[in-house]
Amino acid sequence: MKANKKRHAEHSGLDQAEWQRRFAGLTPAAIGMVEAASTAIERRRTVEARRSLAGALALAPRHPEVLRLLGVLCHLEGRFDESVATLRDALDLRPGDALILNNLGSSLRASGDFDGALAAFEEATRLAPQLAGAWFNLGKTLKVRARTEEARRALEQAIRCSPGHVRARIVLGDTLKALGETQAAAESYREALRLNPRAGQAWFSLANLKTLRFDATDAARLANLAASPDLAEEDRISIGFARVKALDDIGKYEQAFAALVDANARKRRLVHWDAPTFSRQVDAILAAFPQASCVPAGSTRGREVIFVVSLPRSGSTLTEQILAAHSQVEGASELPDLPAVIEGESRRRGVAFPGWVGTATDGDWARLGEEYLERTGRWTADRPRFTDKGLSNWQYVGAALAMLPAARVVVCRRDPVETCLSCFHQLFAQGQEYSYTLAELAAYWRDFDRLCTHWTRIDPGRVADMVYEALLERPEATTSRLLEFCGLEFESSCLRFHEATRAVRTASAAQVREPLRRDTARAAHYGPALDTLKVALGVR
């Protein structure tokens, strides 16, 4: 039991005496059950953890440490609302407890309450400044909320509290990348790998810098790691994707493609995606918005918003960076607010989108538009207009323009083979479950293409395409047309987009810090291996 307490103390930043105080009031039998549950939770053995906690709850149903672990277990099982309620009960029994606050913040964040999560993490760090986990969670949440400099400071504090905190070094690297400090980001990832050479996320994050090139030594290290029989599957997947980048970088394309197929197949087994059901959803959206919504005379609602919609890896970050280089535009990146407003209305009505669209009144759309503008108001604090490039927003263009009639929508497009191949190379942090087989990628691209073609056809005054290849060939003319469509005066700074200093929180963060690159196409390297993809996309 002492060894277990010592392990927890080192992990959390709380000393052994504090851990002993946490168990005050528990019998030796209950303490044993709590320790067993805690170990099982750490190892993600939820059935075992619940069995141990059931015994502890029978002996001490209102003990705060027992309830804290129950809340953590609920979180691990994905029952976030129950986790929040349980952790609030624990906090009522032990007010001002930093560890409970830290756990509560994690569950609030998982349930979508980012403001509540930040408040909990901030209070935890105030009460226990040595608690590395609270600083880490604070930094991670600040990063998600686009408060990037604050995130950096919190993550640096987490590392000061716990120099061996590998995950903090990885997320710090992500934050530095967003701030344009690519070399510092690489050093942070490399330091994480010095601490744990098998940290798959650190390897993939290093690969995901895009502008950094691996060498033969990196490729050999990754090959050895990939062959390790005892590697955790998540690490094996991350290392697999990183190995693809290393093999590409040293010109071994046949091996790279084989590794790419294997890494994607492993990831696909862990996610759920139903392509036919998604296609039927797109059918329903097309039927719900057969024509453009009416624009009320003189309406300016939503004039501040420029939606940049696309599939991943299609030039949307580059397009946003060009717009954000304009003196009138703030680049807000991938905001969750449009789908959140739509999903909230669906819950209120008890009908999934787009099932309620036919009964929505002009007043309903205006209300939803005002809700969106209230949620995103901070993005106009310094500049009058902002971009929103949420990855699922292409599905909601009809709703967005009904809500915000003066908004503009830019549809980013890239060669479909290059788009799908680039997505296939990308291990996404979350979502994009369609991207782990070429067949499902092709089906998703076809759904994107038919819906976005519909938007531009029915509403060309408010929806326009931005083609990546045209931007590469004619950067000044294409940029000029983009600005004109958005109602912006031409500014030469938009041609020097790579000089903009905003935080960029996507996989292309390092690339948009450089001038336009014309060497991003890679399909030619793989030859006949992509024939089935080309057929599925209808490009052969």
Spans of model-derived segments:
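Structural marker of alpha-solenoid helical repeat scaffolds
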Residues: 25, 59, 93, 127, ...
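Conserved alpha-helical positions within TPR/SEL1-like repeat arrays
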Residues: 34-38, 42, 65-76, 99-110, ...
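PAPS-dependent sulfotransferases, especially Golgi type II membrane carbohydrate sulfotransferases
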Residues: 206-207, 219-230, 239-302, 353-384, ...
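Phosphate-binding active sites in nucleotide-utilizing proteins
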Residues: 299-402, 408
